[in-house]
A protein has these predicted regions:
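A generic structural signal for short, solvent-exposed coil/turn residues
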Residues: 24-26, 85, 118
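A structural "domain/chain start" motif
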Residues: 1-75, 174-282
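Short flexible/disordered coil segments
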Residues: 73, 77, 95-104, 145-168, ...
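Sequence-level detector for tyrosine residue identity
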Residues: 45-48, 82, 91, 100, ...
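A short, well-structured beta->alpha microelement
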Residues: 74-88
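Surface-exposed short loop/turn segments
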Residues: 87-160, 263, 271-275, 280-281
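Short secondary-structure boundary motifs at beta->alpha junctions and helix caps
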Residues: 52-59, 114-121, 135-205
């Protein structure tokens, strides 16, 4: 039909590592329970955006993020030598993610030829928190956190439904997350990039800081080798926002006998800058 030319197909971001990770089970005798990730959304956007295809796409991406993180967290736990159980674990991993989406300066414009559309700016901020808890002594826990945000606000220009029926060139609004109205490809790419950056950042933080099951009770060297199958993925690197301004990984430890961790002072400073709560998006 005539409307198809208004749309561009943009596939969903691929969270899968290019090389599947092979896990050789290690019989450490240490078990872990993985709780489902708790997602908390905090949105501040216009009613127009509520019905836009980008909003539908972001919701779908959040589902994919959760599903893929849960799969890879399981892989990392197995790589570290834990046996995954659902009852009576030695340790528990609790993960929560908060996603803040903000639309600024939304302005509606009407045009006889092209219908009604909204111009605005969008920002997204992710914060992840993973607690590694000793099930036999819940005072004994390690807290890992990761955060990522869009480098800058993304300029949007999206069509909205016109109620008065006068317009002879009505724009069809897509409700399919991979079928975007023309002009939304670049914003979608920037949004996808931030999801992928947060995904990788969170997994690397966990991989670098989760103690090996065989090392529990010993001093753990802090290696920064990274989660191999992700580090080897060159396409990931190209699409990552700048690491310095954007991401920080921090480790906070409640006093524990058997899981020493070494938070570096730079991480601590980074974190306080990001959590001053004044302005999330510059």
């Amino acid at each position: 039909g005539g409307t198809s030319s208004n749309f561009i197909n943009v596939s969903m971001p691929n969270f899968k590592p290019q090389v599947p990770t092979k896990v050789e089970p290690i019989d450490s005798g240490v078990s872990i329970a993985l709780e489902p990730i708790n997602i908390e959304q905090n949105n501040n956007y216009s009613d127009y955006f509520e019905n836009s295809v980008l909003k539908i796409r972001i919701e779908k991406e959040i589902d994919l993020l959760k599903q893929n993180l849960e799969e890879q967290i399981k892989t990392i736990a197995q790589l570290k030598g834990y046996k995954i159980v659902t009852t009576n674990p030695d340790y528990t991993l609790k993960s929560s993610i908060s996603i803040y989406t903000e639309e600024k300066n939304a302005q509606k414009t009407s045009n006889f030829m092209s219908g009604d559309y909204v111009k605005s700016n969008l920002g997204i901020n992710f914060k992840g928190k993973i607690d590694f808890i000793d099930a036999h002594n819940s005072q004994n826990s390690t807290n890992l956190s990761s955060s990522t945000k869009l480098d800058s606000l993304v300029a949007l220009n999206y069509p909205i439904k016109n109620d008065d029926g006068v317009n002879m060139f009505k724009t069809t609004i897509s409700t399919v997350p991979t079928q975007l109205n023309k002009g939304l490809e670049q914003p979608a790419f920037e949004i996808d990039k931030s999801f992928l950056a947060f995904y990788k950042n969170t997994l690397n933080t966990l991989y670098n800081n989760l103690p090996k099951a065989t090392d529990i009770g010993k001093t753990i060297p802090n290696t920064n080798s990274g989660f191999n199958s992700f580090d080897g993925d060159a396409t990931f690197e190209e699409s990552l926002p700048q690491a310095n301004s954007n991401q920080n990984n921090t480790i906070e430890n409640t006093p524990t006998q058997n899981i020493p961790t070494n938070p570096s002072s730079t991480n601590q400073n980074n974190q306080s800058k990001n959590q001053d709560g004044v302005e999330i998006f510059e």
